[in-house]
């Protein structure tokens, strides 16, 4: 008898183009595909690769995180580049003067950056401004910041597991009994 060979894991899948049919995104892909081919800069290759990613891999970047990253030694006077969204953070009192480049900036973050005397560039403007990515710093938001990641990992209710269980409701009758959790009397 023959052996059934599973071919489902044979191929490593990576994107060669974005799944999205958004024409503006596809125009950016055309531009950065040209730049990645014609320049010897890895910056353009990384931007192109990030433009292909799925939306869950384009996590939003908060204003506070961006400011913190741009204060690091060697990052002063650089343009933060975000393939994704920049969102506002109410915990930040003062926004420094920043020149930023992103696919999308929320209205409140936009007004705060501009009010501080900053500037917001689109990726086509960045390509004219700095075709090789000189004087830029690539940033991205936390990919594991989504709530769903709290449910991943070691099974809930096992020792040393901090994984969040999927519970239908947070009511009195749902997984709150003695013997269910170590904190409820004992754990069976």
Curated annotation (Swiss-Prot):
Compositional bias segments (type: Basic residues): 151-171, 179-188
Keyword line: Cytoplasm, Endoplasmic reticulum, Isopeptide bond, Phosphoprotein, Ribonucleoprotein, Ribosomal protein, Ubl conjugation
Gene3D superfamilies in the record: 3.100.10.10
Positions carrying Phosphothreonine: 158
Ribonucleoprotein found in the keyword field: yes
InterPro entries in the record: Ribosomal_eL18, Ribosomal_uL15/eL18, Ribosomal_uL15/eL18_sf
Superkingdom as given in the UniProt entry: Eukaryota
Pfam families linked to this entry: Ribosomal_L18
Position of the Glycyl lysine isopeptide (Lys-Gly) (interchain with G-Cter in SUMO2) cross-link: 119, 164
SUPFAM superfamilies associated with the record: Ribosomal proteins L15p and L18e (SSF52080)
One GO cellular component term noted in the UniProt record for this chain: rough endoplasmic reticulum
Location in or out of the cell: Cytoplasm, Cytosol; Cytoplasm; Rough endoplasmic reticulum
Residues recorded as bearing Phosphoserine in the entry: 130
Single GO biological process annotation from the record: translation
Region (Disordered): 150-188
Similarity comment: Belongs to the eukaryotic ribosomal protein eL18 family.
PANTHER family noted in UniProt: 60S RIBOSOMAL PROTEIN L18 (PTHR10934), LARGE RIBOSOMAL SUBUNIT PROTEIN EL18 (PTHR10934:SF2)
Protein name in UniProt: Large ribosomal subunit protein eL18
């Amino acid at each position: 008898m023959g052996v059934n060979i599973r071919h489902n894991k044979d191929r490593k899948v990576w994107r060669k183009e974005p799944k999205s049919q958004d024409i503006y995104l596809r125009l950016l892909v055309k531009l950065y595909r040209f730049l990645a081919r014609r320049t010897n800069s890895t910056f353009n290759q990384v931007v192109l690769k990030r433009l292909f990613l799925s939306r869950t891999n384009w996590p939003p970047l908060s204003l506070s995180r961006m400011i913190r990253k741009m204060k690091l030694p060697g990052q002063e006077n650089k343009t933060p580049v975000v393939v994704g969204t920049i969102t506002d953070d109410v915990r930040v009192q003062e926004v420094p003067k920043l020149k930023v480049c992103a696919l999308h900036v929320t209205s409140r973050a936009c007004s705060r950056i501009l009010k501080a005397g900053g500037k917001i560039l689109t990726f086509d403007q960045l390509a004219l401004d700095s075709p090789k990515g000189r004087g830029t710093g690539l940033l991205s938001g936390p990919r594991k910041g989504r709530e769903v990641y709290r449910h991943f990992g070691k099974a809930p209710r096992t020792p040393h597991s901090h994984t969040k269980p999927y519970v239908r409701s947070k009511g009195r009758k749902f997984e709150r009994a003695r013997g269910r959790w170590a904190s409820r009397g004992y754990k069976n």
